[in-house]
Amino acid sequence: HLPVIPPHFDLLPIEKTESRLKLLTKLLKRKDVTAVINACDAGREGELIFRYIASHAGSKKPVKRLWLQSMTPASIKDGFKHLRSDEEMLPLADAAICRSEADWLVGINGTRAMTAFNSKSGGFHKTPVGRVQTPTLAILVEREEKIKRFVPKDYWEVHATFSVTAGDYVGRWIDEKFAKAKKDGEADPDLRAERIWEEKRAQAIKAKCEGKPGIIEEESKPTTQASPLLFDLTSLQREANGRFGFSAKTTLALAQSLYERHKALTYPRTDSRHLPEDYVPVVKQTFEMLADSGLKHLAPHALVALNQSYVRKIPRVFDNRKVSDHFAIIPTLQAPSGLSEAEQKIYDLVARRFMAVFFPSAEHLVTTRITQVGHAGISHHFKSEGKVLVKPGWQAIYGK
């Protein structure tokens, strides 16, 4: 009896919140209400919630859309000045309905099919299938299988200490003829220039080089490193997990609190890491807010950026083509106060990254030294690398 595809999808009230739905339905049906402003969450799922409520109430009244990027009074006033038309929001509404119905169709049909398949030998083995959960589970299973198939293999490295007039330095033996080999069409991560797969060979290299003089070839190159891009939700969650051990759920909750309760951050559920091209004046105002905020770990850097005119229209920051419904997560014009320790950590991550993208690139001097140790016409190469920070640039914001 598969597939199960209903001619239409019926909506039923959620018992727990049915009283609220009745109140909204009553308000929508009031005769003195001639038009409706949809102020649900500015995203796909917020659009879906409004459409479901309006559909359940049978409302045909004209609709305008309030689209907020932040919850500050100024942003809310600006949102009411620039209400979007209902026609403009139809593609987003269609996408939301499509997602909702696809979840149901994939879930009911996939679960019934896989449950039947896994129960064909007897018994009942419920096997849930979901549009998102099943592909995600497949990724985890694939990774687990790779881990199970992994066979540990010993390798050796030869490290040497060389003495020169200025002092000692360490070099690591490398195969100067090494070329990255392919395994199943992909580069084999186990193969590296410094790895020796036989202990006898490693001992032989050590014996031939120990106590022997070497010839040094040295090259120094200046390099620059730009700051990472502004945060979207995913990159913020990764950074917070790496630095503080916060789960993705915790980071979202903290960012949502900073957006809704404290009005200190812009809309967090964004997939963009850029800003609109006309947002330069707002960015300057945000730097001014940070400079005057009294946040001693942030204010001096904001002041430097303003005094040095760092805030300008940078293509890697301002790009309309890479801004969807929402732009990157940045501080609002409202200085934060009364934050919890965890909220302060998230705010600092966002604020530092926000300032960093406008600061100059960090400048380093990278030195590579190759020491050749010869024996009976055979040279062994030892590589030493050093990196010196010349100008910190944006890294000064992080105390470097």
Annotate each language-model stretch with its function.
Residues 1-108, 193-196, 203, 312:
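Intrinsically disordered, low-complexity regulatory segments
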Residues 1-16, 26, 127-256, 260, ...:
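Long, highly charged, low-complexity internal segments
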Residues 4-10, 34-35, 88, 114-128, ...:
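Short hinge/gating elements
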Residues 22, 31, 73-162, 214, ...:
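C-terminal or mid-to-C-terminal helical accessory/interaction module adjacent to the motor/catalytic core
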Residues 42-46, 69-75, 162-166, 271-274, ...:
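Conserved nucleotide-binding/hydrolysis micro-motifs of P-loop NTPases
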Residues 45-49, 94, 98, 128, ...:
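Hydrophobic (often cysteine-bearing) scaffold residues that line and stabilize catalytic clefts
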Residues 61, 86-91, 112-116, 145-150, ...:
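Active-site phosphate-binding and catalytic loops of NTP-dependent enzymes
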Residues 266-290:
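Accessory beta->alpha helical hairpin/"wing" motif in late/C-terminal subdomains of nucleic-acid enzymes
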